[in-house]
């Protein structure tokens, strides 16, 4: 049996930074309440650990409950400008761990919106990152996530297009081709983060060589879902799992080359647990 781990699997820079800062804030032992706006990352184990240590999750519709001096961690997905201003007015201590790649998209959108450009965001309209980015152009962006949606856009005098940072490269390129015919002047920025791109490329390459492919990450994680889609094209035995205990003997039976990749919100220890589980089950297989 051979277990192969894709390069660039697991925590990305932005997520790692967010987690480190959350634990640093916990260790400060301040007399103020500590919250994260939504789950800090799409990983149930990490969220549970933080909650057990005293970090509360608060949703946007509950923010009125916050008191002056409360600490609020803005997760790596970022938030809208309006929400930022609201929190400042309330006297909340904002701990902003917005991923620098996402911050870059926000800055581009704000700059070009002020210059009078229509903004087009290529991505999932329900994803927190996209919702936050849209908030830097007064929620007036056109959001498209397919070639068909792009074809239905109006014709723009001048437009600026950006991508959700976790998009699949080909998806962005296909939609961009349509956008080029939709504006007299189109300024566009491929804002897919290079860590996402490298992770996807590595998963694509590895899934072509293996009998079974495990994609580890939260079931609601956008970047993990995209990894699963990429791997499924190359390996029919692709499984999206959150935890090692989801792996069964049947998944591995008769297969010798096992591949593993992991989403940006997956800690190293979860990857290690998956490796140990595979070794344990394959040991049983060999003993039969």
UniProtKB/Swiss-Prot annotation:
State the pathway, as annotated in the record.
Isoprenoid biosynthesis; dimethylallyl diphosphate biosynthesis; dimethylallyl diphosphate from (2E)-4-hydroxy-3-methylbutenyl diphosphate: step 1/1; Isoprenoid biosynthesis; isopentenyl diphosphate biosynthesis via DXP pathway; isopentenyl diphosphate from 1-deoxy-D-xylulose 5-phosphate: step 6/6
Functional note:
Catalyzes the conversion of 1-hydroxy-2-methyl-2-(E)-butenyl 4-diphosphate (HMBPP) into a mixture of isopentenyl diphosphate (IPP) and dimethylallyl diphosphate (DMAPP). Acts in the terminal step of the DOXP/MEP pathway for isoprenoid precursor biosynthesis.
Give binding positions for [4Fe-4S] cluster: 12, 99, 193
| Residues the entry annotates as binding (2E)-4-hydroxy-3-methylbut-2-enyl diphosphate | 42, 77, 127, 165, 221-223, 265
Report the InterPro entries cross-referenced here: LytB/IspH
Which keywords does the record carry? Answer: 4Fe-4S, Iron, Iron-sulfur, Isoprene biosynthesis, Metal-binding, Oxidoreductase
- Swiss-Prot/TrEMBL catalytic activity: isopentenyl diphosphate + 2 oxidized [2Fe-2S]-[ferredoxin] + H2O = (2E)-4-hydroxy-3-methylbut-2-enyl diphosphate + 2 reduced [2Fe-2S]-[ferredoxin] + 2 H(+); dimethylallyl diphosphate + 2 oxidized [2Fe-2S]-[ferredoxin] + H2O = (2E)-4-hydroxy-3-methylbut-2-enyl diphosphate + 2 reduced [2Fe-2S]-[ferredoxin] + 2 H(+)
Q: Name one GO molecular function term.
A: 4-hydroxy-3-methylbut-2-enyl diphosphate reductase activity
| Note accompanying the cofactor annotation | Binds 1 [4Fe-4S] cluster per subunit.
Q: What is its EC number?
A: 1.17.7.4
The family assignment reads: Belongs to the IspH family.
Record's protein name: 4-hydroxy-3-methylbut-2-enyl diphosphate reductase
The active-site annotation reads: 129 (proton donor)
Q: Does the keyword Protease apply?
A: no
Please verify whether the record's keywords include Magnesium: no
Provenance organism:
Caldanaerobacter subterraneus subsp. tengcongensis (strain DSM 15242 / JCM 11007 / NBRC 100824 / MB4) (Thermoanaerobacter tengcongensis)
Where along this sequence does the record place binding of isopentenyl diphosphate?
Answer: 42, 77, 127, 221-223, 265
Which residues hold dimethylallyl diphosphate? 42, 77, 127, 221-223, 265
Its needed co-factors are:
[4Fe-4S] cluster
Q: Which GO terms describe its biological process?
A: dimethylallyl diphosphate biosynthetic process; isopentenyl diphosphate biosynthetic process, methylerythritol 4-phosphate pathway; terpenoid biosynthetic process
Concerning CDD domains, the annotation shows: lytB_ispH
């Amino acid at each position: 049996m051979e277990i192969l781990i894709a390069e660039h699997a697991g925590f990305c820079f932005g997520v790692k930074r967010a987690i480190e800062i959350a634990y640093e804030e916990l260790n400060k032992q301040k007399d103020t309440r500590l919250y994260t706006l939504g789950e800090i990352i799409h990983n149930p184990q990490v969220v549970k650990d933080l909650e057990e240590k005293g970090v509360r999750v608060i949703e946007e519709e509950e923010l009125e409950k916050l008191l002056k001096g409360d600490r609020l961690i803005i997760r790596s997905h970022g938030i809208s400008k309006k929400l930022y201003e609201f929190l400042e007015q309330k006297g909340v201590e904002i701990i902003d761990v917005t991923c620098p790649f996402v911050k870059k998209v926000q800055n581009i959108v704000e700059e070009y919106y002020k210059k009078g450009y229509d903004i087009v965001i290529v991505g999932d309209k329900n994803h927190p990152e996209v919702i936050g980015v849209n908030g830097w152009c007064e929620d007036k962006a056109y959001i498209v996530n397919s070639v068909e949606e792009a074809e239905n856009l109006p014709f723009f005098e001048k437009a600026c297009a950006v991508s959700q940072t976790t998009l699949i490269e080909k998806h962005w390129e296909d939609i961009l081709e349509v956008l080029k015919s939709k504006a007299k002047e189109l300024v566009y920025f491929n804002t897919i983060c290079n860590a996402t791109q490298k992770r996807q490329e590595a998963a694509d390459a590895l899934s072509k060589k293996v009998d079974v492919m495990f994609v580890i990450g939260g079931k609601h994680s956008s970047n993990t879902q995209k990894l699963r889609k990429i791997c499924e094209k190359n390996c029919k035995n692709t499984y999206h799992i959150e935890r090692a205990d989801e792996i069964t003997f049947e998944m591995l039976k008769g297969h010798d080359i096992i591949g593993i990749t992991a989403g940006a919100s997956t800690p190293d220890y979860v990857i290690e647990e998956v490796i140990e589980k595979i070794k344990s089950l394959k040991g049983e297989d060999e003993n039969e």
